[in-house]
């Protein structure tokens, strides 16, 4: 997490969004409060996030694995403004792409890799690639 703090500081991050239960819990554990977060409250590691009350608004959405539903997309649109926890019934992983596309400049999107790694992407550096990726995704 020290690396994430260093990245955020050197990048001048103004907002940090987290996707995933373990990632979000680790941010809280290390004193980094995300601007908004998306969780599904299901993890292989049995993590329970107690600090979710810091978010002003809870949005519950349905989102199947491998998709970003319109409902989930709308929730991310609200979440990038801040103070939102998105509770996903289904799978939240793909929402990291929506956060990268919709987040304002000087934002970081952090999500977990299934093998246990933490990925923290400065959106200004990756937004162009994510926008191209959306050209290949099917609209559902």
Swiss-Prot record:
Keyword Zinc: no
Protein EC: 2.7.1.237
Entry function: Catalyzes the GTP-dependent phosphorylation of the 3'-hydroxyl group of dephosphocoenzyme A to form coenzyme A (CoA).
HAMAP family assigned: Dephospho_CoA_kinase_GTP_dep
Family from the record: Belongs to the GTP-dependent DPCK family.
Origin superkingdom: Archaea
Gene source species: Pyrobaculum aerophilum (strain ATCC 51768 / DSM 7523 / JCM 9630 / CIP 104966 / NBRC 100827 / IM2)
One example GO MF annotation: GTP binding
Origin organism lineage: Archaea, Thermoproteota, Thermoprotei, Thermoproteales, Thermoproteaceae
Pathway(s) served: Cofactor biosynthesis; coenzyme A biosynthesis
Binding site residues for GTP: 21-23, 40, 42, 92
Record-linked InterPro entries: GTP-dep_dephospho-CoA_kin
Catalysed transformations (reactions): 3'-dephospho-CoA + GTP = GDP + CoA + H(+)
Name of the featured protein: GTP-dependent dephospho-CoA kinase
Record has Membrane as a keyword: no
Annotated keywords: Coenzyme A biosynthesis, GTP-binding, Kinase, Nucleotide-binding, Transferase
GO biological process: one example: coenzyme A biosynthetic process
């Amino acid at each position: 997490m020290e690396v994430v703090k260093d990245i955020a500081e050197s990048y001048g991050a103004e907002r940090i969004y987290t996707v995933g239960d373990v990632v979000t819990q680790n941010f809280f554990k290390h004193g980094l409060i995300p601007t908004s977060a998306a969780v599904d409250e299901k993890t292989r590691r049995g993590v329970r996030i107690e600090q979710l009350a810091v978010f002003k608004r809870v949005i519950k959405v349905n989102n199947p694995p491998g998709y970003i539903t319109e409902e989930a997309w709308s929730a991310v649109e609200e979440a990038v403004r801040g103070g939102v926890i998105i509770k996903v019934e289904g799978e939240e992983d793909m929402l990291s792409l929506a956060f990268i596309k919709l987040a304002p400049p000087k934002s970081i999107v952090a999500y977990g890799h299934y093998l246990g790694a933490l990925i923290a992407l400065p959106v200004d550096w990756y937004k162009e690639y994510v926008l191209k990726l959306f050209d290949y995704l099917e609209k559902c």
